[in-house]
A protein has these predicted regions:
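Assembly-associated, polar helix/coil segments characteristic of icosahedral protein shells
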Residues: 1-112
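Alpha-helix initiation and N-capping motif
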Residues: 33, 53, 62-63, 80, ...
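Short, Φ-rich (hydrophobic/aromatic) sequence segments
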Residues: 52-62, 133, 137-153, 157, ...
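Short helix/loop capping segments that flank catalytic or ligand/cofactor-binding pockets
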Residues: 58, 84-85, 91-95, 102, ...
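Alpha-helical scaffold segments that mediate packing/assembly in large oligomeric complexes
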Residues: 101-196, 307-313
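Extended oligomerization regions of viral-like shell subunits
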Residues: 162-297, 305-313
Length: 313
């Protein structure tokens, strides 16, 4: 898809005529097929209107733990490579009329191949319910799709293999570095993990773990009886804790705690969300179906930015 084609599509998606046609089609009401055709995908779905797409982006950020922490970028053309800088940003002082002397920096970038992983979800509703004149179908569908996508995305952002889904932070070779190895998680191990992360990444660092691990850490004390968890503001060593139940529990061979700057985890949106209405497939059951899909990739572009605790056997 070329940039010109994308711009033309975006312009059409912003028009009120397209918005009206899209939502009438979603409710199986008469609609302008020529208007809707402007947003039809090669899979027979239709892209969300511009305003609805903005709502979807906001809803996904609410539903996905990672979307609120990661760097989100857009790469909707067919290009499949990004360059990420892997050095300390360069700067220098110079006299008022002096010249800056910087290197060319060409060797400071790492090339990453970006894929287009397709994520889909099927929603089914009672026909009478979806045709109810009082139903806010736009917000209802957006909320349902975002809940489904958000849950599936986070699972991949943690454990994804990078083949048919994004590469997760716990990937053995392309994920976060191991900061601490332990056979029994202690107060000291958590402190060690914190300081295993370089100061520049600790500055915006956050913790990530599941509920079971969080419960354990809430009870963890040092030898003086001091809790490691600040129960007043839910922080550990002054840094906020984010619960993601796709993280593993404390067990042999697992990585139950991650800490670092999650802005170095990049989520690359390859195509916007589209919805296909299944008018006939579930008609005999008195239902109407919707298939929503999106294309994206994600990966940790600086492995030292996030570190994990590895529990040994």
């Amino acid at each position: 898809m070329t940039i010109d084609t994308i711009n033309e599509r975006d312009y059409a998606m912003a028009m009120p005529e397209y918005d009206y046609a899209f939502w009438n089609a979603a409710k199986r009401k008469p609609h302008n097929a020529n208007e809707l055709k402007k947003g039809i995908t090669n899979e027979g779905g239709a892209y969300l209107p511009l305003q609805a797409n903005s709502k979807m982006t906001a809803a996904l950020k609410r539903e996905s733990v990672f979307r609120s922490l990661a760097t989100i970028s857009y790469m909707r053309d067919h290009g499949g490579i990004i360059l990420a800088k892997h050095c300390v940003e360069e700067g220098c002082w110079t006299p008022e009329n002096g010249m800056y002397t910087f290197g060319n920096g060409m060797g400071e970038f790492t090339e990453y191949n970006i894929k287009s992983h397709k994520l889909g979800t099927l929603l089914k509703y009672d026909e009478a319910y979806m045709s109810d004149i009082g139903l806010d179908i736009e917000n209802h569908l957006i909320d349902s799709i975002a809940k489904s996508f958000g849950a599936m995305e986070d699972a991949a952002y943690v454990n994804g293999r990078g083949d048919i889904q994004p590469t997760g932070i716990l990937h053995n070779t392309r994920g976060a570095e191991i900061g601490v190895t332990t056979s029994a998680l202690t107060y000291e191990d958590v402190v060690k993990l914190f300081f295993s992360v370089k100061p520049k990444y600790r500055k915006r660092g956050v913790w990530m773990m599941n509920d079971e691990t969080a419960y354990y850490l809430r009870t963890l004390k040092d030898e003086g009886g001091n809790y490691i968890w600040n129960h007043t503001n839910d922080t550990i060593l002054g840094k906020p804790v984010h619960i993601c139940n796709d993280m593993p529990s404390i067990g042999a061979g697992d990585k139950p705690i991650a800490f670092g700057d999650f802005s170095y985890y990049w989520i690359i949106i390859r195509d916007d969300v589209s919805v296909k209405v299944l008018n006939e497939l579930y008609h005999d059951d008195g239902q109407i179906g919707y298939i929503a899909r999106e294309y994206l990739d994600a990966k940790l572009i600086r492995s030292e930015a996030i570190k994990v605790i590895q529990v040994t056997d």
